[in-house]
């Protein structure tokens, strides 16, 4: 069941730190096992910036601005999704990573956020140019969710409180 919580987000380049904080805070509020998720976009030329701060960068400059500002830099990028699962005692974090590049001009209409800018390695299309099924088959978020699923199949007792 989806629960819409307004949790203040800590500022960190590391998505793992953001997710751990969000998971603990969410559990504190709902008092039941809960899953949270966040993503980061790590640009090699900027030593990993904006990382977990991508939401704030996108709010400030938007898709066009981010593509434009990277014009003269190495556009090699890693995108990372972290899913945090908290049972009140501990937080398990599951990570999915996809390597690729930030394209200069946004392409595509699907997805959200920076999807029109991110082109996975080995693909000629951005996430936003892909059908949802195609993107989901390779996405960083799906990799993290599959890791969580695999963990829960092996350790269902983690959800016992």
Please give the residue ranges for each predicted region:
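Anionic-ligand binding patches
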Residues: 1-161
């Amino acid at each position: 069941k989806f629960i819409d919580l307004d949790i203040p987000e800590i500022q960190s380049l590391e998505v793992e730190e953001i997710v751990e904080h969000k998971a603990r805070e969410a559990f504190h509020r709902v008092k039941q096992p809960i899953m949270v998720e966040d993503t980061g976009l790590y640009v090699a030329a900027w030593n990993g910036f904006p990382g977990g701060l991508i939401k704030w960068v996108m709010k400030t400059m938007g898709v066009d601005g981010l593509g434009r500002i990277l014009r003269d830099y190495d556009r090699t990028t890693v995108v990372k999704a972290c899913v945090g699962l908290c049972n009140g005692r501990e937080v398990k974090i599951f990570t999915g990573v996809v390597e690729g590049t930030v394209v200069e001009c946004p392409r595509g209409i699907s997805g959200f956020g920076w999807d029109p800018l991110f082109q996975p390695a080995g693909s000629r299309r951005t996430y936003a140019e892909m059908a949802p099924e195609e993107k989901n088959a390779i996405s960083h978020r799906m990799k993290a969710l599959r890791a969580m699923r695999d963990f829960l199949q092996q350790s269902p007792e983690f959800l016992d409180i």
